[in-house]
Amino acid sequence: MAATVMGMRSAVMLFVVLLFVGGAPAPTGANDPAASNAAAPNRAHLSSPPAAPAPATPVPHSPPYFKIVPASQLGKLGSSGSKPFFRGGTRSRAGVSSSATVSPRVATASPKIALYNGLNKPGENAGLTGNAGSPPDSTGAIGPSNYVEMVNSSIAVYDRSLNLVSRATFDTFVGQPSGVLLCDPQIQWDPAANRWLYAMLYCNLSNSVQRLLVGWSKTSDPSTLSSAGWCQFAAQTDPYLVDFPKLGHNSHYLIVGGNLYNETNPSTNPPFVSAAIVWVPLPASNTDTNCGTPSLGATPLGLKNGDNTTLAFTPVPVNTDSSATDGYVVSAYDAGGNVTALPTPQSRLAVWHLDAAGVLHQDADIPVTTYVMPFSAPQLNGTINLLDTLDGRLTQAVGDPVTGIWTQHTVNGAGNRSVVTWYKITASGSATTLADVGTISDPNDWVFNSAISPRFDAQGAAIEYNRSSLTTYPVIAAQIRIASTPAGQMEPGELVLATSSNFDSDFTCNNPSPGVPCRWGDYSAASPDPVQTNVVWGSNEFNTASGSTPAWADENFALLVAVAPHAPTAVAATAGDGSARVTWTPSTFDPGAPATSYKLTAYVGASPVATMTVAAATSATFTALADGVTYTFTVIAINPVGPSPESVHSNAVTPIQAATTQVPAPPTASRDPVLPAPAPPPPSR
């Protein structure tokens, strides 16, 4: 029989307590494993995209449902409701298509991607205080001096070597009692004003008291995790829960996009009402110690896509990595049945931009290849527990309007395996262009839960993601591209950053019934390094154990393109007896792939006459040289990518045989010969 997908709202997050505490029934029927194959024939492509409206249509912004106040004026928020429900992401198809084949993973070419300074370290995990929920909603951002990681429900600050500097649970961070559930975090670095920005949600699922929390650091130092170090505000959004809030900014505004659900009657499954875009003016100074209450702008209910007919869903503001004055917002037309009765193939991205005056404009849609909501991902060991791959929505966007805005989503691919489609969009005012598009796929694995970011120098991008299959526990992996990479592609190969040690089977997998996909994600992070401008940093999750208790763990990492080293410099030689000692200085190179060996060549005139290879070092001795012959030397550095150019020649040296000094025998002591005494004269007569 044909699959039926029941309407249900997005969820914020689930905590272990929900498994044991009574509450209203969870929504049902969204992921029937038996329905997956029957659903496949419904994946028809649209014959033609709808006509786009005139570009740059101003959007009204009177926010009757939003009011912003300092977080200190909220009083103490109550304990969050215990009603379990799921995000729209759980609409992911639960079944594994019968057309899928399983075979060993095909080896790829040696990857050009590498770790910056070897940085790939564990971050937050489900066992730490405040992190008992699932999924983690892993996110993070890099600044000049720190990497900041956020998960449900904690924040951690690291130095640029990923050593922990400070950590706090969200309730401590914003000054609320222990146990208040704050979730769906977002964190970004604002390079225009040298400060940090955040957004998160008060996850109150039981009544009409709803809050969206936003704020910024008072200085460029994020490590004081309280109101002493941060300006913190809360938008009263009663009665609407602003689910799946996504953060972005330009040089003037903090921008949040989200989906509104009416929480007036918590005894029912509240319906989706509208998407919303909210913006808060940022102080001009990068040192805001007064924390004056800002104004707030927001779209009215009923925000539509560029076709001016269908409701928008999950608008994603761009994390602008420059001083651009226009702040863009992108959204994929809903393929998951969140705003319609059933999942529907889509082929458009909606775009808005907020100008420097705080006016939001509806830009023309961007046509893209038709995409369909993905199937859920299987795991090793043939467990019934599949992994939620979300519902085709965009989850993050990073970049600059001129050099490129990068975004991505998980959609259905060949063999009904999920794939990640990424987009590069350029924009100027209301004019937007799809500059590039590509897909991350695997012949055997499901690929999902991705994040993409350009490099700060705009000379490439990195994408990280999860993948799993019936033969693979979930892994975190990444790929990279540079300016010369062909359109629509990444450089060959991938870098595996972390591998799960077991399949995920936590309490979310059986709520409301066995076979419902395990909550995974719901998103991950990628951001450009403003200091080491060819590096992209990220965070994503993997799993450490099976069982009903969440066992997710975050991995934080820094990625760059591995290149052959530059030529060594300052090559010098000193002659010996039939030998020469050669020294050199390793030249600067991308620290992701240091030299592992050096090749030395001896020259007589312009002709190479001998070579030798040594392990990584800064000196070596060339032996078996001919005395009396003049030599010069060059050095080549070698790493896994390849050799460097040859260095310049050293100074000329001439080995000579050590002079043999003839030391005379020590003098022997001697005396003049003793002559016999003359005979006495004969006696006289």
Question: Where do the PLM segments sit?
Answer:
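Beta-strand-rich modules
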Residues: 620-644
